[in-house]
């Protein structure tokens, strides 16, 4: 956070950060994690917009707690270029939070299914509403074609890796696992 955080000591002078992996599956693949388009450092947001015109694929991450709101979609329509990007993937992040918002389901499978249905419908309805308003419809159509979204939970992924390596959870991970235990069928193994 000293290098890329909004209040980092070196944030203002960092142009980019490169990480390399020795993995044959990633040969000739370049993955770029750009700052968000609403980055607090305005120049980085502008660099992101320029860079998107050169990308083949864009992964649009949206926190499931406020998943793909009309404001998010309008923002994407005004900032995503209509040229360059050939494929768009929508990813709902922190999916564990979405599941935990379900106060009625008894089983983890039911909570997962209901959460996915809620977020899929929300994404479709909000995109359709923006299409009706005719905001950058070319980009909207490409976003709609990418439905349904995929959902991820980095905290549960971290838990699974720690469980596999016999490591302890940190406080946040332990709390999520504890809260998910209320669902029948959820197993911490």
Regions picked out by a protein language model, each given a short descriptive name:
Residues 1-189:
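Globular "head" domains of long coiled-coil molecular machines
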